[in-house]
Structure formats: C-alpha cells, structure tokens
Amino acid sequence: MIQQETRLKVADNSGAREVLTIKVLGGSGRKTANIGDVIVCTVKQATPGGVVKKGEVVKAVIVRTKSGARRNDGSYISFDENACVIIRDDKSPRGTRIFGPVARELRDNNYMKIVSLAPEVL
C-alpha cells in the first residue's frame, strides 16, 4: 500500500528515477493506494536529458508494490519493490519503454498501452 510521502522507483524511461507521493487520487479521505491506482508525485531524482525534470509534479500509476494485491481467485501477488509509471491525463505513459514486470490488475483498469509495452505481465 502506498500513502503520502512514500518514495517509489520509476519503471519507465521518462527521465525520472525516483518520485515522492504527494496525494492519492480517488476520493477526499482516501489514504492508501494499491496496484492500478493513480497518484500525484514530485520527481526527486531524474536522469539528465530526460523528458521529466527534478521537482516536476506528475501523475503516475502504481505497477508494483511490496505489500502486493489479492486476486479474485484467492491468490496474492507481491514484488520486491514499489514502482510506478508516469502517465499523461489520458492514461498513456510519458515514456516509450517499461522496465520490469507489471501486475495483471493494470489490464482491468484499462492501462493497455502500459501492459503492451511491459516485458512481462504477472
């Protein structure tokens, strides 16, 4: 579960390497976010020459969490790190590549471009 002030790795080539969560979108009193939820972040580390600069406020969708997620068949999936992909307002990724596996829950939330770019969907 991701909450305010959580730092996440960025799993795309948009230029950001690490982001800090500012807000969890989806309701006035919402505290935590899981895989497939949208968050507002600020870029804490960025690579030189990237599309996204340090200090920029961006929207991102969570693709991997350490706490994991429960599926409808009763199974759980969890990852070694918390990671996100920076997106535009139309849910398309700002980068052109996705690094590492992503969860199948993104397909249910209509992030088809991220699912198609990912090397592995678990």
UniProtKB/Swiss-Prot annotation:
Name of the gene this protein is made from: rplN
Role according to the record: Binds to 23S rRNA. Forms part of two intersubunit bridges in the 70S ribosome.
UniProt keyword terms in alphabetical order: Ribonucleoprotein, Ribosomal protein, RNA-binding, rRNA-binding
NCBIfam families: rplN_bact (TIGR01067)
GO cellular component labels: cytosolic large ribosomal subunit
Protein name, as recorded: Large ribosomal subunit protein uL14
One Pfam family cited in the UniProt record for this chain: Ribosomal_L14
Family recorded in the similarity comment: Belongs to the universal ribosomal protein uL14 family.
UniProt-recorded Gene Ontology molecular function terms: large ribosomal subunit rRNA binding; structural constituent of ribosome
Subunit text: Part of the 50S ribosomal subunit. Forms a cluster with proteins L3 and L19. In the 70S ribosome, L14 and L19 interact and together make contacts with the 16S rRNA in bridges B5 and B8.
PANTHER family: 50S/60S RIBOSOMAL PROTEIN L14/L23 (PTHR11761), LARGE RIBOSOMAL SUBUNIT PROTEIN UL14M (PTHR11761:SF3)
Domain of life: Bacteria
GO BP terms: translation
